[in-house]
Amino acid sequence: MTFQTFKNCVIAIALCMMAGVSIKAQEPSQMQALIGQSLSKLQQQTPDAHLNCIAELKRVEAMFPDSIQPKYQMALQSLSFSVANPKAEQTENLLKEAEQTIDKMEQMKGADQSDVCTLRGFLYMVRIVQDPAVNGQRYYMNVMQNYEKALKINPNNQLAQQLQQKFLEGMKQATGSN
């Protein structure tokens, strides 16, 4: 009888451990599904859709606080909203939150530093878009250094390449250079 109890206890422990492993294995796919669901809101290119997406990404980040991907997407979408709507009332808070998120990501083990530098460069780029006359000279080097560092770490970082190109084109237009 004791052996049967022991056997049942071992089976119960094994099942609990397997369930725990199964739940942990499902977390990344569940997280990815939630992120994808949030990003699908961006099919409507409206400020409200963008803000709803960001709010959902914040909830996903709260569910998975040790994961980098929700933080990355939340910061990226906050910056995307801010560059498209530099004078919106939500922009300043979104930029502060994005900066805090980038700072957190920078300290996280396993964070892609190329992505962190890209986001930081994008943050400074948005600051320039907000007020080019004041922030252009202040943040120009920060933008360039962050994109260059991102591309030095990962030369295949498509977002860093695209943002750097857009920034250089915008600066040429702003200064009248060819």
What is the role of each PLM region?
Residues 1-31:
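Bacterial Sec-dependent N-terminal signal peptides
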Residues 23-64, 68, 72-73:
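N-terminal leader/linker segments that initiate helical-solenoid repeat arrays
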Residues 38-47, 80-89, 121, 126-135, ...:
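Short coil/turn linking the two alpha-helices of tandem helical-hairpin repeats
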Residues 43-58, 90-101, 137-141:
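Helix-turn-helix repeat elements of alpha-solenoid scaffolds
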Residues 63, 108-109, 153:
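Structural marker of alpha-solenoid helical repeat scaffolds
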Residues 67, 112-113, 156-157:
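Residue-level recognition of tetratricopeptide repeat
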